[in-house]
Design a protein with these regions (language model features):
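Beta-strand elements of repeat-based all-beta scaffolds
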Residues: 1-56, 60-76, 80-97, 101-118, ...
Length: 205
């Protein structure tokens, strides 16, 4: 299982995996630097906590933000730019990707995403329950269904092709286990242990 370490400000400082791999996190002003296997990734945030840049060995990614904190564009190394469009309510209506083209989005009166159409005219349709919780996501190939308990916690995500993920929570509403089941009924279970409000270990079975 993974071991998590935190500093006196309750910030994550290290993740130690059973394999011996360790990831460290260092903090300086509005920047956080993560080092894993000798590779450093520096993330910088603005005064409101919004990510504005990522620097790694491949170069710099810059996030240009609107006044509401949402990105208007993201510029990757080589000046590769992804652009975003929004409606008057601040809802994303388009995403222009240099490799995959433009995706458009449509919403219902409650602001729920109803339809997503990509550059190849492939459509994803979404439905919601009376509490505006996502109920189904339907693609041409399959449908994914979402189930909740009386505490508004997501308990199951199941696909029409036979895969599923089950979630169990403790009395404090924290995720205590997650079981992923494949089409052949093989599964992976993760059990979470907490120290205060932080995950202290994850056990895989």
């Amino acid at each position: 299982w993974n071991i998590y370490s935190y500093d006196t400000y309750d910030r994550l400082t290290a993740i130690s995996e059973p394999s011996g791999r360790k990831t460290t996190h260092g903090y300086s002003g509005n920047s956080i630097t993560a080092v894993e296997d000798g590779i450093s990734v520096k993330r910088t945030y603005d005064a409101l906590g919004n990510l504005i840049s990522v620097v790694d060995p491949a170069g710099t990614i810059t996030y240009n933000l609107r006044p509401d904190g949402q990105p208007s564009s993201i510029v990757a190394p080589g000046n590769v730019t992804t652009s975003f469009g929004y409606d008057g309510f601040g809802r994303r209506t388009s995403l222009g990707d240099p490799s995959s083209g433009t995706t458009t989005y449509a919403y219902d009166a409650s602001g729920n995403l109803l339809k997503e159409t990509n550059a190849n005219n492939k459509v994803i349709n979404y439905t919601y329950d009376t509490y505006n919780r996502l109920k189904t996501a339907t693609l041409p190939e399959f449908t994914t269904t979402y189930t909740y308990n009386g505490y508004d916690e997501l308990t199951k995500v199941s696909s029409s092709v036979g895969t599923s993920i089950d979630y169990v929570y403790d009395a404090l509403g924290r995720l205590s286990s997650q079981t992923e089941t494949a089409v052949d009924n093989k599964y992976l279970r993760k059990d979470y242990t907490y120290n205060g409000g932080n995950v202290s270990s994850i056990k895989y079975t």
